Each structure stands twice: as C-alpha cells, then as structure tokens.
Amino acid sequence: MKSVRYLIGLFAFIACYYLLPISTRLLWQPDETRYAEISREMLASGDWIVPHLLGLRYFEKPIAGYWINSIGQWLFGANNFGVRAGVIFATLLTAALVTWFTLRLWRDKRLALLATVIYLSLFIVYAIGTYAVLDPFIAFWLVAGMCSFWLAMQAQTWKGKSAGFLLLGITCGMGVMTKGFLALAVPVLSVLPWVATQKRWKDLFIYGWLAVISCVLTVLPWGLAIAQREPDFWHYFFWVEHIQRFALDDAQHRAPFWYYLPVVIAGSLPWLGLLPGALYAGWKNRKHSATVYLLSWTIMPLLFFSVAKGKLPTYILSCFAPLAMLMAHYALLAAKNNPLALRINGWINIAFGVTGIIATFVVSPWGPMNTPVWQTFESYKVFCAWSIFSLWAFFGWYTLTNVEKTWPFAALCPLGLALLVGFSIPDRVMEGKHPQFFVEMTQESLQPSRYILTDSVGVAAGLAWSLQRDDIIMYRQTGELKYGLNYPDAKGRFVSGDEFANWLNQHRQEGIITLVLSVDRDEDINSLAIPPADVIDRQERLVLIQYRPK
C-alpha cells in the first residue's frame, strides 16, 4: 500500500512540475524559437535528413534531436507543450534510468525513488529539462551509455558483456547524432578512473570494439545520407562546431576555468546542503566499486568542460544524474546517523526563499529602484514572484519540523517556480525575449506582409514559427545563419543596411513589407537609418516598421 502511495505521489509530482505548467510559458528566443522552427520546417518539408532554419541549411547540430522535437510537435501540435514535449520526455527517461541504476547498485526501492525525485527537482535539471534545447537529449544518451557500460562490466557471461557493449555503442552513436563527437569523449573520460582503479582493462579491450562497431553502424545510414546530400556538412560540423567552439582562442562562449563552480552550486538547489557531504562520503567510500563509478561519472566531465575554452551551463547536465544518486544515498545515511546536513539544507532553502522575497520587493514598483523590473500595472506578476519564493522558504521550513522524516519535502521547494514562473515574467522581458508576445500584439499587421525582415535570428525563428512561414529575410545581421546564407540558392535571403533602400524600391509594389528590429530601450527609433515608413509600432525592445505599396 505504501508503494502505491509513493507511485501516486511521484506521478503527481511529475504532473505538477513537468506537464501542467509547461503551456503557460512562452518560448524563449533564441534557443527555443530556433529549435521549434527547425522541427516545424522538418515536418512541413518532409526532409528528415538535412536540417534547415528559415529555409536555409543549418549545420550547427546533427539530426537526432530535431527528430525527437519534430515528433513532439507532430503528436501535440505546434504549441508550447509540443515544442517542449521532446525534452520533457528525455528528462523523464533519464530519471527512469536514475531509478533503475540506483536499484541496480543498492537494491533499495526507497533510495531509488528518492534519487529520482532529487534528480527531477534539481534546479538545473528542471530549468534545462523543460526548456527546448538539445542538451536533455544528449544527457539521456550519456546516462544511458554509462548505465550500459556498467551493465556490461558487471555481466558474468560473454553474451551479457557483448550485449552491454553493443548497447553502449548505440547510445554513443545516438549521442553523436544528437550533439556530435563529445558523446564519445565524455563516456570514455567518465569510465577511465573506474577502469583503472578496478583493473578492468582486459574486459574493455576485449569487448570495447563491439561498442565501436555498433556506434559506427548507428551513425552510418544518416551520416552517408547527409554526406551525399550536403558534402560540406561533416567538414563544417567537425571543424567549426567542435574545434573552434571548444578549443581555439576564438571559441564560442569563452569562460574561465572556475565557471562551473557557481553553476553546480545554483544547480544543486534545493539540495545544496547535501552536495559537500555527498561528494565527501563518496570519496571516503571510494573502495566501493559503485561509489567510485558515480564519483568518476560526476567529476570527470566537469573537469573536461572546465578545461575547454567554450562553456555553457547546459554542458554539464549529465553530471547531475550520478550526483543525485550520491545525494540520495548520503541523505538516507544522514537521516539515520547525523541529520546536520539535512538541517543545513533546510536553512539554505529558507535563506534562498527569504532573499528572493526581499529581492522581489527591491525590483518591484514599490521598491527603491528608479527603473523597476515590473511596472505598476503588473502587480499580479510581483505577487506571483513573491509566491514562488514564499513557497520555497515554506517548504524549507517544513523540512526542519521533523528533519529525519520531512527532509524529502525539499523537493517541493521549486513547486511555486514550476507553477507560477510563466505568470511572473515582466513585460519588459517578454517584449524582447518572447517573440510570441510580440506576434500576439502585432498579428494583424504581420499576417498580410509579403516580406518580413528582421535583424535577429532568434526573433526571425519566433516569427517564422508563430506565423508558420520560413521565408523571413535577415536584415543587416546574419548571426548563426552566416554559413547557410553563403550558398547560391540563399541569394535574396539577406539584405544589408546599405542595400535596404534600393531593395525596398524594387519590392515595394509586390505587397506590404515589414521590418522587425531589436532596439535598445532608450534608443530613438526616429534616428534609425531607414526610409520613412507608413507604420511604426514600438513594443519596447522590438519595433515593427511597415511599408505599404505606393
């Protein structure tokens, strides 16, 4: 009966966090609008081999993540939930692997359930796992690969070992098809310390080639298909998207070595109080084979991405699966022996909630700031933000009432965030970061436009997805579409600032021409170097400028 209650509670938890509130949040640009539009175009064109964005070749990532996203929109429609359905599914599958692996290691159902809940409620997991990017997919394949490797190394027969390594190769292959060759480097780095300490080199060398073969066979069909269709894909993807992004001096998203320290700290909420103890207990118990495996799986990718020049918080998502297992194991031991860490965790959550309440007041219309984040007419959004932090502090306090039994309720600290964050985003943020909001405000003007031009790829993708058209033209800036725009068949998809006046004269009689520009909040739009317009509609950070036929 208790198991049934736990399962009902888990399903309610998943529904409240990962299902019910998702549609209330508009898509963020540039990431969510980009991936939403790529998948929409894939469904519309029927081309499941070559990814396109705004009708242009888009070679920043391979194809598998787009497949899953496209299936999500096919099943649930072109809406906010449909766009995010794929990442939510991947996150829940990863949580299922956390459950399975914890059971495999410790044979404890309660521990497995707690590890799952901890994983799903970690701030970084929830933030990325409900956000339409490709990282939850690669995290799933990496976690599946680590589970497969463990399965192979624990098998007692050659058939079991062979099956495990074949499965490892398939997961690595799917990882390559999702985000590239990092899906090969990360698992290898993660298992090497464990293989070395356990002296398991023999099994690795005997059966490892099976993983290589299955990985190649997994990638080969699509790899050959896209090489035939687009011979330049692999050169661009390997050199630009791997070498330049991570290793060269001009790498994208450059950050210092310590970049991931605050990411891990913030990402570990609402379980931050367990982080030091979980890692220390794991190190102290390093003679235990499974603990070494989890530690290596947590730390090695973190070190690898810290050394790389290009860094983003999403890169280390897969590290939090083993960390959640270590935290759950440590928390149960602490509850029995010394609940100090659990009390500290409760106080951290209270402090975080109270700090959030104070910060919300400071940036509210009633605070001391001259330019508040929310305007007076957005009072309900301020109260939503207060509710988010109040619930966080409340559940932090509740875990302290009987800490040995109530500590798992820390998983409910982000409940207010899950349910209310979509209602608390300030208009000034929505106007710049949510193209759907802009489209809703200017729908009547945008819909009949013969041509739409914009200077932001993220806004362009949002306009294309909302209006169901992929012919948005880039104006002044090419951004990440620079490579696709270099192809001969992309001629006419970019208009420079100097060329715009002539281009306008040539195309004005064909229909309404709409220019959507990103501007600074205090920028005078009358000073823009553009021909006089028939309509100007400013929505704070985005401005619609329209030219009608003469």
Curated annotation (Swiss-Prot):
Transmembrane segments: 7-27, 81-101, 111-133, 137-154, 165-185, 204-224, 263-283, 288-308, 315-335, 346-366, 382-402, 406-426
Membrane topology, record value: Multi-pass membrane protein
Primary localization: membrane
Molecular-function GO terms, alphabetical: 4-amino-4-deoxy-L-arabinose transferase activity; mannosyltransferase activity
Record carries keyword Lipid biosynthesis: yes
Pathway the protein acts in: Lipopolysaccharide metabolism; 4-amino-4-deoxy-beta-L-arabinose-lipid A biosynthesis
Alphabetical list of InterPro entries matching this protein: ArnT_tfrase, Glyco_trans_39/83, LipidA_mod_glycosyltrf_83
Top-level taxon of the source organism: Bacteria
Cell location: Cell inner membrane
Catalytic reaction annotation: 4-amino-4-deoxy-alpha-L-arabinopyranosyl di-trans,octa-cis-undecaprenyl phosphate + lipid IVA = lipid IIA + di-trans,octa-cis-undecaprenyl phosphate
One GO cellular component, as annotated: plasma membrane
One GO term (biological process): lipopolysaccharide biosynthetic process
Pfam families: PMT
EC number: 2.4.2.43
Keywords linked to the UniProt accession: Cell inner membrane, Cell membrane, Glycosyltransferase, Lipid A biosynthesis, Lipid biosynthesis, Lipid metabolism, Lipopolysaccharide biosynthesis, Membrane, Transferase, Transmembrane, Transmembrane helix
Enzyme class: transferase
HAMAP family: ArnT_transfer
Family from the record: Belongs to the glycosyltransferase 83 family.
Role played: Catalyzes the transfer of the L-Ara4N moiety of the glycolipid undecaprenyl phosphate-alpha-L-Ara4N to lipid A. The modified arabinose is attached to lipid A and is required for resistance to polymyxin and cationic antimicrobial peptides.
Protein name per UniProt: Undecaprenyl phosphate-alpha-4-amino-4-deoxy-L-arabinose arabinosyl transferase
Source species of the chain: Escherichia coli O6:H1 (strain CFT073 / ATCC 700928 / UPEC)
